Amino acid sequence: GVCLAETGHQVICVDNNEEKVKLMKSGQAPIYEPGLSELMQSNAKEERLVFTSDLAMGVENSDILFIAVGTPPLPTGESDTRYVEAVARGIGASLTTGYKVIVNKSTVPIGSGDWVRMIVLDGVAERKKESGTEIAAEFDVVSNPEFLREGTAIFDTFNPDRIVLGSTSQKALDMMQELYTPIIERKVAEDKSLPPVPVV
């Protein structure tokens, strides 16, 4: 999120941990990543970056919603996807009107786009049941796995060897291409003379 703000986008970072939100609002990164705190501070000062624990506010005020949560391994070796499920359900419960692209960046098994869509729809149904009102939620899901190394995540984000996008929706893919244009065109790359980043 911080790197997308650095490319000029308006970004709302949502975390359910109030202590982390307070830390991020103070300009401190909750993880060790060289240069991250400085990027957070400069983009918050430029009003391109906001931190909150209010998921509904983040959903309402965004066109593209990223699910970027941990998926620690279970004893079986499979990914623990409960945090992805909780966020997807929360997004569904917060959707109102207007088209949204929901992007899963978390490490999940291949084919999880349909699963994320189902969980979001469950969240929509729960909200509809609670409120008794019709909810016209329009959204598509994009899988966008990240290939970041701890300690060099900022460099890796701005200098990828490829960007991987998967979706059944061309509209969603077009929005993602537009979002990533500064990175694709190497505008924030260390070596700006390199050819455009391939999108696969």
What are these regions (language model features)?
Residues G1-V200:
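Structural/interface elements that position substrates and couple domains in central-metabolism enzymes
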